């Protein structure tokens, strides 16, 4: 060590490591700690702390030496306004504040005052303020950030007031190239489009007649993403008429009731998308939880018109089109010759026939996601198995998928993500995957009721590569999974960082002990678990707490423990575990890994 100069150590070795490994290195010796603090941290220009939720003290320790940052990403789940304010400054060009469950919109005024040079801003906030207060703070922020090129504002909650962005159109900087807003009323979105108007007339009245606004040729928005109460023809026509230069359009709506026939999306709106001749990415999704509301006025003819109007699409995402059949979806696959990403949700008429000639039309496919498409069977997957560039294959809730297609999947040498949730696969199918060289890093077998402990052994205890590459594994809701499967995982998976075994009723304390022992004995290239979900594992006892305490699970960032015996002693468990690990997030609320779907409902007492 003495022979290696400090500069060589910093420049040639330490600066090549990510933050996680830098922290590990700094714990080895005072020499290495000094090299990290003085030689590496001051030179960092970008820092991403989204993988765990630091408290105030941890954040201060991490950022103390980072004096050259221009890009910062924070998981703000447990941070207050004062902590966030302390990291802001004119040096920042890019700022991402995620999961701000404790922050009111006052933080917007801090950003506008302290970060005048921002180019990129992302904010995920809970609904904590009245619309008037939020609008006032938002206006102040936008006026203080005149150079923004990308802006993402997501407000989440049960009853979010969709008028929160009512005045945003008056303050948006003309430098903006990418915009995402959630939530937004359709009527407000149309007024916003009028603000972006470049030439010609715009449509703001039901009869589509209105006066001209003064043109604003300086707006060059290329990416637009909106979560709305309604997607309609009026909205699409307003968007395409005002932003013909759009490259990416992402629209999702969540209507409370069935739209009126004259105020819904029809062929007219889909055909109008052709005015955006540079459009390469399109997402149209209708999401209605517990309600049967969909795009009922769109059938194959509407998709025919879309495929003819937008032949340059490289990414297509459609959800809530139950009347579109194979002919409609196949027209997209055949017309869009450069299609790389194809996602369809809830298409009840989509079957294997749509993919009959997929290699002859869309051989460039890299991602295919077919979620809740009940007519899709293994035959479609066999056809997709001929797409040699496929990297992501999502067949979640396609219940007719069986073992017969897994040999085809095993031939996909670039596949890194595979979702078989709810499929009718068995232990024999796991043997096919386990013997293959497919480099899968993310695998979901959730709800695969015919896969047992033996199947997990076939998957991971063979000569294939998956045991070496797998980093995320979901075995939730699988009645055939017990401690034996977990023991196999700890023995074979050296790269695993995320594991979900929620609602696995036969998993006991022995599994927690096995995972803890594996963590403590990890050597060489073995990684540590970062996220573990044992929600509703009813066979776990409070005796497993001893294995969740130090020194076990040293790298754990998130632990889901809802509906277990731990939940009955929430305060004691939180004090015992989080007292030793202030950066660890405990979730008793049934969230998926990392609370990606429910952070806005958490309170400080839960962390």
From Swiss-Prot:
Alphabetic keyword roster: Leucine-rich repeat, Repeat
Protein's UniProt keywords contain Repeat: yes
InterPro entries linked: F-box_dom, Leu-rich_rpt, Leu-rich_rpt_Cys-con_subtyp, LRR_dom_sf
Classification via SUPFAM superfamilies: RNI-like (SSF52047)
Pfam families: F-box, LRR_6
Residue span(s) of domain F-box: 9-47
LRR repeats: 51-76, 77-99, 100-125, 130-155, 228-253, 262-286, 295-320, 321-346, 347-372, 373-397, 398-422, 424-447, 448-477, 478-503, 504-536, 537-563
Database matches in PANTHER family: F-BOX PROTEIN AT-B, PARTNER OF PAIRED, ISOFORM B-RELATED
Name listed for the protein in its UniProt record: F-box protein At-B
Lineage summary: Eukaryota, Viridiplantae, Streptophyta, Embryophyta, Tracheophyta
């Amino acid at each position: 060590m003495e022979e290696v100069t400090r500069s060589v150590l910093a420049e040639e070795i330490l600066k090549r490591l990510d933050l996680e490994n830098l922290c590990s290195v700094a714990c080895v010796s005072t020499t290495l700690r000094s090299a990290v603090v003085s030689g590496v941290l001051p030179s960092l220009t970008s820092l991403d702390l989204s993988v765990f939720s630091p408290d105030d003290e941890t954040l201060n320790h991490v950022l103390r030496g980072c004096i050259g940052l221009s890009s910062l990403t924070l998981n703000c789940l447990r941070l207050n306004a004062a902590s966030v304010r302390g990291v802001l400054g004119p040096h920042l060009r890019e700022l991402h504040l995620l999961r701000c469950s404790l922050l009111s919109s006052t933080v917007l005024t801090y950003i506008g005052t302290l970060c005048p040079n921002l180019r990129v801003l992302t904010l995920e906030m809970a609904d904590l303020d009245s619309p008037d207060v939020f609008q006032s703070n938002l206006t102040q922020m936008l006026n203080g950030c005149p150079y923004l090129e990308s802006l993402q504002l997501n407000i989440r909650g049960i009853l979010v007031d969709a008028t929160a962005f009512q005045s945003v159109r008056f303050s948006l900087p003309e430098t903006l190239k990418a915009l995402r807003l959630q939530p937004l009323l359709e009527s407000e979105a149309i007024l916003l489009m009028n603000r972006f108007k470049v030439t010609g007339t715009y449509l703001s009245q039901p009869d589509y007649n209105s006066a001209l606004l003064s043109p604003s040729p300086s707006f060059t928005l290329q990416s637009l993403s909106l979560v709305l109460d309604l997607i309609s023809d009026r909205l699409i026509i307003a968007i395409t008429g005002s932003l013909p230069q759009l490259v990416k359009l992402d629209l999702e709506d969540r209507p409370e009731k069935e739209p009126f026939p004259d105020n819904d999306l029809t062929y007219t709106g889909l055909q109008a998308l052709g005015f955006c001749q540079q459009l390469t990415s399109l997402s149209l999704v209708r999401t209605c939880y517990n309600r049967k509301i969909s795009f009922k006025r769109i059938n194959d003819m509407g998709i025919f018109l879309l495929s003819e109007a937008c032949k340059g699409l490289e990414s297509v995402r459609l959800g809530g089109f139950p009347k579109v059949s194979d002919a409609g979806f196949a027209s997209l696959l055949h017309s869009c010759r450069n299609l790389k990403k194809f996602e369809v949700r809830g298409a009840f008429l989509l079957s294997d026939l749509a993919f009959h000639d997929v290699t002859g039309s869309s051989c460039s496919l890299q991602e295919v996601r077919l979620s809740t498409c009940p007519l899709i069977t293994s035959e479609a997957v066999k056809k997709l198995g001929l797409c040699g560039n496929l990297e992501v294959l999502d067949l979640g809730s396609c219940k007719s998928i069986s073992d017969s297609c897994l040999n085809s999947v095993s031939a996909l040498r670039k596949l890194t993500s595979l979702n078989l949730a709810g499929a009718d696969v068995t232990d024999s199918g796991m043997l096919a995957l386990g013997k293959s060289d497919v480099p899968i890093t993310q695998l979901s077998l959730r709800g695969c009721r015919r896969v047992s402990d033996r199947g997990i052994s076939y998957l991971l205890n063979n000569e294939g590569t998956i045991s070496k590459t797998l980093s995320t594994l979901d075995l939730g809701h699988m009645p055939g999974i017990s401690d034996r499967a977990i023991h196999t995982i700890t023995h074979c998976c050296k790269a695993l960082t995320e594991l979900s075994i929620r609602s696995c009723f036969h998993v006991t304390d022995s599994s927690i002990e096995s995972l803890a022992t594996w963590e403590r004995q990890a050597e060489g290239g073995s990684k540590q678990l970062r996220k573990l979900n044992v929600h509703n594992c009813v066979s776990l006892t409070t005796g497993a707490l001893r294995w969740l305490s130090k020194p076990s699970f040293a790298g754990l960032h998130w632990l889901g423990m809802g509906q277990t015996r731990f939940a009955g002693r929430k305060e004691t468990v939180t004090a015992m575990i989080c007292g030793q690990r202030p950066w660890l997030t405990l979730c008793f609320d049934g969230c998926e890994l990392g609370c990606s779907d429910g952070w806005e409902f958490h309170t400080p007492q839960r962390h």
